[in-house]
C-alpha cells in the first residue's frame, strides 16, 4: 500500500465522524440560539473540506514526532490556531507584524471562509483567503504523504 493510499484512506474514514461532529455542533448552536438557515448546510460542507486540512496536519505531526510528543505538540497547535485565526479576538486589534503573520497562515482564512458561508456574507471573503487556504491545504497533504512515506521506510529498516 502506498503512503498516499493510506493517508487518503485515513482521511476518508474520518469524514463520517467529522460530519456527525458538525451536525451535533450546529444542533447545539441552534438550541443555544443560532437561527436555523439553509446556509448551515453549505457551512457543514465547507467545514468538512477545512477538516481535511486539519486531519492532514494531524497526520503530519504524527509522522514527525513519536506518540509521546503528539499530545503536547497538538495542544500547542490548537492554541496557535485559536490565537492566529481571530477566534479569541480580531487579529486587526493587535495589528502590525502579528496581523501580517496571521493573514499569511491558513487559520484566519479558514475562520473567515466558514463565517462568510454561515452568514451568507462573502464581502469579507477575498480571493487571498481562498488562495492562502488552498496553498496550505495542498502543501500539508503533500508534506504528510512525503513524511509518512519516509517514516514507513525508516520503520521497516
What are the functions of these language-model segments?
Residues 16-20, 119, 146:
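N-terminal hydrophobic signal/anchor transmembrane helix of membrane proteins
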Residues 29-30, 59-63, 86, 100-103, ...:
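Transmembrane helix-loop junction
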Residues 3, 7-72, 79, 129-130, ...:
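Alpha-helical transmembrane segments and their short interhelical loops
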Residues 23, 27, 56, 89-96, ...:
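Transmembrane alpha-helix boundary/anchor motif
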Residues 65-104, 108:
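Transmembrane helix segments
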Amino acid at each position: 500500500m502506498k503512503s498516499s493510499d493510506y493517508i487518503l484512506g485515513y482521511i476518508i474514514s474520518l469524514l463520517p465522524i467529522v460530519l456527525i461532529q458538525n451536525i451535533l455542533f450546529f444542533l447545539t448552536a441552534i438550541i443555544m440560539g443560532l437561527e436555523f438557515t439553509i446556509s448551515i448546510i453549505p457551512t457543514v460542507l465547507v467545514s468538512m473540506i477545512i477538516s481535511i486540512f486539519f486531519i492532514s496536519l494531524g497526520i503530519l505531526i504524527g509522522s514527525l514526532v513519536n506518540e509521546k510528543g503528539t499530545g503536547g505538540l497538538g495542544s500547542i497547535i490548537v492554541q496557535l490556531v485559536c490565537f492566529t485565526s481571530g477566534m479569541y479576538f480580531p487579529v486587526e486589534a493587535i495589528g502590525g507584524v502579528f496581523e501580517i503573520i496571521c493573514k499569511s497562515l491558513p487559520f484566519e482564512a479558514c475562520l473567515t471562509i466558514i463565517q462568510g458561508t454561515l452568514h451568507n456574507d462573502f464581502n469579507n471573503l477575498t480571493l487571498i483567503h481562498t488562495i492562502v487556504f488552498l496553498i496550505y491545504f495542498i502543501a500539508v497533504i503533500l508534506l504528510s504523504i512525503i513524511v509518512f512515506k519516509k517514516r514507513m521506510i525508516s520503520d521497516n529498516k
